[in-house]
Amino acid sequence: MLWTWVRIPPPPPNIMKKILLLLILLLMPGNIYASAPVIKGLNILKVAKKDLAQVGHWKRTPTVVICEHAPIERDNVREAITWWNKRGYIFYHSIYLRGSRSTETCNNPDPTGYITINLVTQETFEAGDNLAVTHFYVDNDTREIHWAKIYLKSNVEERVLEHEFGHALGWMHTEKVGHLMNEKLIYGGWGDAGLKKH
């Protein structure tokens, strides 16, 4: 039997880059972003991830509280609040860092009127590739959000806090590529279609 060796030239550089990018995307863990928000009070609700959906709204203007061990700086929180301000959402500008009011609010299981930012604990977080989780309470009859608790891992990636504020404002995940509320960090972006307050 006679063997003939044929040499195949390597693909052009632009094709090689696309192949490498595809391989990287396929090998990355799929859920590197945030776990689905934990909604308390609201009856079970099916929301299609393809469509952006808001399951609740704030009647009162929420106050943001940075809890004692939260892995985020005050300036980062201000930037995230400003991002949402530009889309029509209002927050009280008081951001408590220390003191009895902050501790009391952060330890309250029902911090009505507040969005708290905390470091994750074993009770609030599932193991895996998730970067953050938000718990919030929605009144079943009025769809009013009473409170929200954002839990962050110690290494906060870009866009994660803005994404979690989206959950604190009642927004669910979407599959839209490039959108802030996309569940996966690699497919998300700063897109805000549908997020502007009317």
Question: Which functions belong to the PLM regions below?
Answer:
Residues 153-198:
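The catalytic-center signature of Zn2+-dependent metalloproteases
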Residues 74-168, 172:
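Metzincin-family zinc-dependent endopeptidase catalytic domain
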Residues 19-28:
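Sec-dependent N-terminal signal peptides
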